[in-house]
């Protein structure tokens, strides 16, 4: 089984407002609250659905320090943490070869999802590039997690 109970969050955008310390402190407070809530509800797995950072080309060292400490916090709290690459995490909008999260790869329990991950009835999909979106409608998985902007697809 891929997971028993999962907690998800998305689009935290560390580094917003010019890498503002106030904003990054608010993000950190949210991560702490999120972990508390997830643990209260018995979640052993976390999926972050993309856009950890706000600026694909201007994330500063202070923001990177917030990233490391909060990813370590998530890694300690959950058995598995899947970190999906969103469009703001990628250097190029139309390809996934360079991202702002690669340096957290060695934090225990953290799994960076920069390519499609499909296992049993679960699919975890990073920012969709080129015409990959066409594959989604044919998927049979019960659970599909991703950072999506799909043409012609209404989401709610």
PLM region descriptions:
Residues 1, 117-118:
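Short boundary motifs at domain starts and secondary-structure transition points
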Residues 1-2, 7:
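Short, intrinsically disordered N-terminal pre-domain segments
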Residues 10-13, 148:
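Short, small-residue-rich loop/turn micro-motifs
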């Amino acid at each position: 089984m891929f997971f028993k109970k999962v907690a998800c969050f998305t689009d935290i955008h560390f580094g917003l407002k010019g890498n503002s310390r106030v904003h990054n402190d608010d993000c950190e407070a949210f991560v702490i609250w999120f972990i508390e809530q997830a643990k209260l509800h018995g979640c052993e797995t976390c999926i972050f659905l993309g856009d950890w950072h706000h600026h694909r080309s201007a994330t500063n060292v202070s923001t990177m320090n917030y990233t490391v400490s909060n990813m370590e916090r998530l890694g300690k709290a959950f058995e598995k943490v899947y970190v999906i690459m969103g469009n703001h995490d990628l250097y190029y909008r139309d390809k996934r070869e360079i991202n702002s999260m690669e340096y957290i790869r060695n934090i225990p329990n953290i799994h960076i999802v920069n390519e499609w991950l499909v296992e049993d009835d679960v699919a975890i999909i990073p920012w969709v590039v080129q015409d990959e979106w066409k594959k989604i409608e044919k998927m049979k998985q019960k659970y599909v997690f991703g950072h999506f902007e799909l043409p012609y697809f209404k989401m709610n």
